[in-house]
Amino acid sequence: MYAIFQSGGKQHRVSEGQVVRLEKLELATGEKVEFDSVLMVVNGEDIKIGAPVVAGAKVMAEVVAQGRGDKIKIVKFRRRKHSRKQQGHRQWFTEVKITGIQA
């Protein structure tokens, strides 16, 4: 059984017991969270597709960790001008463990 849900503007395909890295959620480690915006649920041959969400479906999860991702570098380079600008960025994330899928 797996489900596709939406969080932080992105869609994630998950199954029970899986650990997923999401955009930052303002929750403490160990807190439980439910995602109501479930787009699709597949249980064997039974497929439920929402328009746009599946009514009554939920994905339950528990917050495992909060952190920051790897640094990415942004470089702006102007040729022949002896000028360049370099900047770094680390995005915050929340790791959650999927505890259940309710269809």
Swiss-Prot record:
Q: Which UniProt keywords apply?
A: Ribonucleoprotein, Ribosomal protein, RNA-binding, rRNA-binding
Question: Which Gene Ontology terms describe the biological processes this protein takes part in?
Answer: translation
The reply to whether Ribosomal protein figures as a keyword in the UniProt entry is yes
The cross-references to SUPFAM superfamilies, in alphabetical order and at most eight, read: L21p-like (SSF141091)
Query: One Pfam family of this protein, by short name?
Result: Ribosomal_L21p
What's the subunit arrangement here? Answer: Part of the 50S ribosomal subunit. Contacts protein L20.
Q: Which NCBIfam families match?
A: L21
Please state what the protein is called.
Large ribosomal subunit protein bL21
Source species of the chain? Haemophilus ducreyi (strain 35000HP / ATCC 700724)
